[in-house]
């Protein structure tokens, strides 16, 4: 059974809890963000370019020393590379004297490589020529399509101009004259139209009658739908 409906005989009163002897005393709870965080000055260490270290260093001497080390390393690697390149080089066919050539001697691998290189160069040239031809054909096709599109747009524009202006409409005399007839408004034959105007302003073939049964609209309606 719930105890939510029971009356409170002893309500809570402030000043009697733990740490609440004096209500006028300020709270002693602090947040960690209210406390001072940086309480010590950080000094530069020995390897962080302190002003004393910068004054005592000789930058020119250090730069010259680094340059000498780089040149020494470069010269150390150069003879090995030159030796390897000289060993890898083989005498070409055109460099061999004619006296050393023999008809029975087979061609070396380098000659075969030269032939294959020439064949590959020819194939590459043929492929490049074919690619240029394809690009040229595509460019011509694109230009032709653009010209056709422009011509079609110009034709549609001229048709719209000629059909929109009756003075420039050159479709021929077979066109009906009814196309130039101005349409009447839907409220031209209503009863109470232009009631405030005078009788002289109205047309002679129309007369205003302030009677629904004797009006022109009622007569037309009866003749059209009843008779």
Curated annotation (Swiss-Prot):
Family: Belongs to the CWC15 family.
Subunit structure: Identified in the spliceosome C complex. Component of the minor spliceosome, which splices U12-type introns.
Cellular component per GO, a single term: U2-type catalytic step 2 spliceosome
Keywords for the protein's UniProt record, in alphabetical order: Coiled coil, mRNA processing, mRNA splicing, Nucleus, Spliceosome
Localization per Swiss-Prot or TrEMBL: Nucleus
Role, per record: Involved in pre-mRNA splicing as component of the spliceosome.
InterPro entries for the chain: Cwf_Cwc_15
Bias-annotated ranges (Basic and acidic residues): 52-84
Coiled coil: 121-165
Matches recorded under PANTHER family: CELL CYCLE CONTROL PROTEIN CWF15, SPLICEOSOME-ASSOCIATED PROTEIN CWC15 HOMOLOG
Protein species of origin: Xenopus tropicalis
Region spans: Disordered: 1-130
Pfam families to which the protein is assigned, alphabetical: Cwf_Cwc_15 (PF04889)
Biased composition (Polar residues): 24-34
Protein name, UniProt field: Protein CWC15 homolog
Keyword Nucleus part of the UniProt annotation: yes
Biased composition (Acidic residues): 102-124
Gene Ontology BP term (one): mRNA splicing, via spliceosome
GO molecular function: RNA binding
